[in-house]
Amino acid sequence: MVLLSPLSIFSLSSLLNLPKQDIDQAVEDLHAILNIPEDQNHSLRLHHPSFRDFLLNKERCGDSNFLVDEKQAHQTLAFDCIKLMSTFLKQDICGQKAPGTLVTDVGIRVENYLPPEVRYACIYWVQHLQKGGIQLQDNDQVYQFLQVHLLHWLEALSWIGKISEGIIAISSLESYILVSQSSFREFLLITTKG
């Protein structure tokens, strides 16, 4: 309910690190509210976007069994994105071996190297952190991810044409750091200011 862009059942399974059968079972009886394509490589979509608002609003959704805690859902997705990227991202992810290769030269192979759930994670993980109200600190999971995978993440963003979003995301992270004098803050300043 809080995805920032639609994903397929396969991609959700990978992003959430859940068996595909669990996702299938969870959406099985939701045809009235979800467009569930026969081709499970196509994205799930809500028939009525207002239903999302209903599930996220405590006053409108009278049944706590259906109520979705939006902040908690964003926190979970943020860390699911980080876990997926930590597992998947690496140097020279598209196997080009030569710096300066154009995206047009790699073409459709970028989709093979960066499947939809990885592209989703790369683009939206910081927004999920922000919407989840997560405060950052030295040596937390976010700091450790960036220390190891910052360049891998930026490389992936460049392959999918989203590098400017990455630079903006890095700059915005600074306001979520708890302590004003921290190595995490210094790391982000060095990253953005050079």
Regions found by a protein language model. Give the residues of each.
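Leucine/isoleucine-rich amphipathic helices and adjacent mixed helix/strand linkers
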Residues: 1-194
